[in-house]
Amino acid sequence: MKRTFIMMLDSFGIGAAADAEAFGDTGSDTFGNIAKACAEGKANEGREGPLKLPNLARLGLAQASKESTGQLPAGFSDDVEIIGAYGHADELSTGKDTPSGHWELAGVPVLYEWGYFSDHTNSFPKELTDKILARAGLSDYLGNCHASGTAILEELGNEHMTSGLPIFYTSADSVFQVACHEETFGLENLYTLCQIVREELEPYNIGRVIARPFVGTGPSDFARTGNRRDYAVEPPAKTVLDKLKDSGGEVVSVGKIADIYAHCGITKKIKASGLEALFDATLEELKVAGDNTIVFTNFVDFDSHFGHRRDVAGYARSLEYFDSRLPELMALMGEDDLLLLTADHGCDPTWPGTDHTRERVPVLAYGAGLEAGSLGRRKSFADMGQSIASYFKLEPMEYGESFIK
């Protein structure tokens, strides 16, 4: 029985990419800088001491990082029994965003430039917002700027609740975000508005619209909820997910995976929010997954709760929690199953600003008869998609080199 389990540690980069300078990200290293902060006692909130990831270490994480950056992360050692195949991958895609990383992993790099709203204030063209407001029956909106999602709630959340006007904002990514209160504005109203925005953005080549619902009574307790929804454009070609689905296989999305691929190539969708719930849901799907199945989970909290918010201790705590549960997952694997752990970009919580960082990502592969040891530098995330295609004996992808023969 052949099954592949893809665990996407959203934003868990392992060192600046070769082209990081073009993004202002030279020196970024999500894993390495978290490990350094932990070793220096600077991440002791809710945890203590050096970063402890024994199960990921056995899969080759620290060695992959060493090959990427030239040095072992602080607190990690070469003296560990490696049981998996490990490597690091550069990104071919032009951006450091979520769709680009996910699509490239599945064999379809984004080789064109996304559209962006580059102005930090008055970010959106009036022609665009006028059309959105007219279709949505709204008189105005708030925001129109680059912002952190939590900061803009503190700034504009109260005004939104009293005025009923949605909050529009963006970032360095190719994205249009809409924040609205679940109760005063209404969740379904937010989703309807975001669908309108998605349709009106077609000429602008924007990768995603993100619905950002929140709850609370004021700045001190405003909190974004798990009812986020992403409205992505479709990948420009068939991914390995599509190819498996077309061949009669199953592709199970856990978390926001289906949204990222615009629901293309997905046969089953499992909603879950939060690291624990996502892991629980993943284990349940692994227990029932049949032959020719991919179970694909995005662990978004690493990025949204800790990377963007520059919360080093929170990121470290969550990595340690994730690591502690890996044995449960591995115990469910059959001898022919393939486990892949990777990331879609970096989001170094020690880095200036709140945006993603252009980094290499880990490629940790276990099972399916793979020999433990180094896979070396992979020229594209698409090597993972090509390897999945090889594993399932699908038609080869256009991009990528398989490490499964």
From Swiss-Prot:
Transit peptide keyword on record: no
Pfam families named in the record: Metalloenzyme
Record-annotated disulphide pairs: none
The organism's place on the tree of life at top rank: Bacteria
Pathway note: Carbohydrate degradation; 2-deoxy-D-ribose 1-phosphate degradation; D-glyceraldehyde 3-phosphate and acetaldehyde from 2-deoxy-alpha-D-ribose 1-phosphate: step 1/2
Binding site for Mn(2+) 2: D303, H308, H356
Signal peptide bounds: none
GO terms for MF: magnesium ion binding; manganese ion binding; phosphopentomutase activity
Entry keyword set: Cytoplasm, Isomerase, Manganese, Metal-binding
Cofactors demanded by this protein: Mn(2+)
Enzyme Commission number(s) from the entry: 5.4.2.7
Co-factor note (free text): Binds 2 manganese ions.
Gene Ontology CC: cytosol
Enzyme class: isomerase
Protein's cellular compartments: Cytoplasm
Chief subcellular location: cytoplasm
Family that this chain belongs to: Belongs to the phosphopentomutase family.
Function summary: Isomerase that catalyzes the conversion of deoxy-ribose 1-phosphate (dRib-1-P) and ribose 1-phosphate (Rib-1-P) to deoxy-ribose 5-phosphate (dRib-5-P) and ribose 5-phosphate (Rib-5-P), respectively.
Name of this protein: Phosphopentomutase
Organism: Shewanella sediminis (strain HAW-EB3)
